[in-house]
Amino acid sequence: MIIEGEVVSGLGEGRYFLSLPPYKEIFKKILGFEPYEGTLNLKLDREFDINKFKYIETEDFEFNGKRFFGVKVLPIKILIGNKKIDGAIVVPKKTYHSSEIIEIIAPMKLREQFNLKDGDVIKILIKGDKDE
């Protein structure tokens, strides 16, 4: 399944969470890469329900005396021009985003690497529909 979304600015919270060693380790183990410390937010033209796909759910954990919630992780390919970049949609247990906004992680800062700006449209490829 290919989904198109418009690049939008986020709150900057992804940067904090992705800078924490436990999250870095979790994502590296699941995805095979250490994600850039930040997410790329995409606004879709419809609601996104990760529960329709074969995602991986991480456990809650404690770090430096604080409790952190797990996330649902869905590996994807990010399609920009003729490039296919490994990435993932991440859906935290606690989120402030509407269901039309998805957060994407990748091994690099996608905005810089591909000169993306708010309003640009990119595509993502999702495999692993629960019905497959």
UniProtKB/Swiss-Prot annotation:
GO BP of this protein: FMN biosynthetic process; riboflavin biosynthetic process
Cofactor binding mode and count: Binds 1 magnesium ion per subunit. This ion is coordinated by a threonine and an asparagine, and by the alpha- and beta-phosphates of CDP.
Protein EC: 2.7.1.161
Swiss-Prot/TrEMBL catalytic activity: riboflavin + CTP = CDP + FMN + H(+)
Keyword Amino-acid biosynthesis attached: no
GO molecular function, one term: magnesium ion binding
Similarity comment text for this entry: Belongs to the archaeal riboflavin kinase family.
Name listed for the protein in its UniProt record: Riboflavin kinase
Organism: Methanocaldococcus jannaschii (strain ATCC 43067 / DSM 2661 / JAL-1 / JCM 10045 / NBRC 100440) (Methanococcus jannaschii)
Name of the gene this protein is made from: ribK
